[in-house]
Amino acid sequence: IPTQVTALGFIQLVADMKLEDNFIPLIIPAIAAPATFFYMKQYMESALPLSLVEAARIDGSGEFRTFNSIVLPLMKPAIAVQAIFTFVANWNNYFTPALVLHDDKMKTLPILIAQLCSADFLKFDMGQVYVTIAFSIFPVIIVYLFLSKYIVQGVAMGSVKG
């Protein structure tokens, strides 16, 4: 369901919970997004054979150890991909923060860039807009560079040795 469809109910919920001008209404839905859950479930079904978990149980491994030793290492590529997708989507999100955050100190970069561009057309400084856009790209690049090694490990783990 598009965010715009559920926006009115979301804003009413945020107001009822008195969470306006707070980052919590932006963080919680990002963590528990249905698309992320679906992708992780699909990846787990395709990359994690149940026989591996059953073999660990037969060998006497507990649930916690099985998860940490078998499931989590196999899920690292999917977790990295979803972390990148979620970070980029929320870093570039304009709509939801514009509805929830009203204090100027709480504004996100997309809102700041939009405000810079919507200032007086003849007087706003395009150089300032471009510098702000350049600074907004750096965290995305850093997150990608940090998490890309897990994606490469996942691709290498699935390759066939010759």
Regions of interest found by a model, annotated:
Residues 1-162:
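A structural signal for multi-pass alpha-helical bundles of membrane permease subunits
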